Amino acid sequence: MNLHPRRFIRPALGTLCLATLATLQACNGDACFGVDVCFNNNNTQTVALSGTAATGDALASAQVTVSCVTGSATTLTDGGGNYRVTVNAALPCVVTVTSGGTSLHSLAYAGGTFNTTPETELMLVYLAAQLGTNTAALIGNFQGNPRYQQAMNSPNTVQAAQSAVVTSLQQRYSVTLTAPAFLTTSFTVGQPGVDSDLVALAKAGAIDANGMPDPAAVTLLTQAGAAHPL
């Protein structure tokens, strides 16, 4: 019997242990999987979110609240409606931006760019209707409802809702939207793209004077979502 492989087993195990120790140290003792992803002992992860809050105009100096299945954080937007926040969280998260009479919502199923606009509000209207509920109940109860969490944490489900918003608004209001991926596309207020689409929707009557979706647009997306239940 050849016993020579034993010479290599111990060094290999030693190297593996050192690598594992170094990885844990890089995550401050938490478990790490993949590249730059650290999971804390309570199964949360450090999530960095950014985005722009706008209605066609920037929601400047607005309150931003990120509420996740586990974990929350707050910040303020800058003069251009931009926000950045880091939260130890279990996904998904709801983003709420409040400024005066305007309170808009969005969601995040990963780290990265997730904007908050009247379009994202309507996306949640559609998603809530698919789940047989309304936006207030979806936002208020998702932390304790695995079915809501599953839908909100699914990129495919969220992107399908986003596409439904674009299709419904274009057909109803006779506009051409140039940024169909409005949830995750970085944009600057006053520039072509997501913001110019918001301006066009406001002119067409889909967004009211307070920067909120018009009731007719809410009804439109409620009916569309209910017609495609999850």
Q: Which residues fall in each region the model found?
A:
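Feature for extracytoplasmic/surface-facing segments of secreted or surface-associated proteins
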Residues: 27-230
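Sec-dependent bacterial lipoprotein signal peptides
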Residues: 1-27
